[in-house]
Amino acid sequence: MASRRRASPRKKPQQRRSRAMVEVLVEATTRVLLKDGYEACTTNRVAEVAGVSIGSVYQYFPDKESLVLAVMERHQEQLQAAMVVRLSELANADLATAVHEMLGAMLEAQRLQPRLHRVLLEQVPRIGALRRLHELNGQYAPLVEAWLETHRDQLGITNPSVAAWVLIGAVEGVLARVLMEKPGWLELGLLQEHLTRLVLSYLQPNVRRSKR
């Protein structure tokens, strides 16, 4: 079986006009995905919604997979921007408060465009972007690792890097299933409470060991 080609833009926009065109195309792709779904998201349809020629689309994106990848990257950047701000505000908070608020920020970010997030999760394997998604999600790791490092003595964590990956994987796994199967739960404070208990149950045994 032939290996799946990784979707990617045809070229990176350098000038302001080019960047503006790419933004128009990415926004049009988002609208098509949300309104019509992945199957109907063709380069011709994107050009129509964007109000540009098909040639303008192909100037920057060779196919619909690369367009969807660009949507995914922008969506992840928006989620991460929200997390960076919240984590910086929690640098000196106590453990329970920081975990609770950090998870609240993650849920709030997921609520920005849950339908889009769900569509992207469904189609990532089809566009050969699973590795890229892992790369983008991996950008959370240094943020969480830095926060764990500040609480290292309190938690008794010997390897904040590993701990960060375990925590991110656990929470992202839950959120992915919620988005796919129970999207209404994103609005429930109860989900935040359960995730807080999940994370603290992983971290608190380290606290007990450090006090022996």
How does the language model describe each region?
Residues M1-A20, N206-R212:
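N-terminal intrinsically disordered/low-complexity leader segments
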Residues V22, T43, E65, L69, ...:
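Short, structured helix-loop boundary elements
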Residues V24, A28, V32-S66, A70:
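Helix-turn-helix
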Residues L25-L33, L79, M106, V144, ...:
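Short hydrophobic clusters on alpha-helical segments that form packing/core surfaces
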Residues E77-M83, T97-H100, G104, E108-L112, ...:
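Amphipathic alpha-helical packing segments from all-alpha helical-bundle domains
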Residues V85-E89, L120-I127:
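Short linear capping/connector segments at secondary-structure termini
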Residues H117-E122, L130, T150-L198, S210-R212:
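Hydrophobic/aromatic-rich alpha-helical bundle segments in the mid-to-C-terminal region
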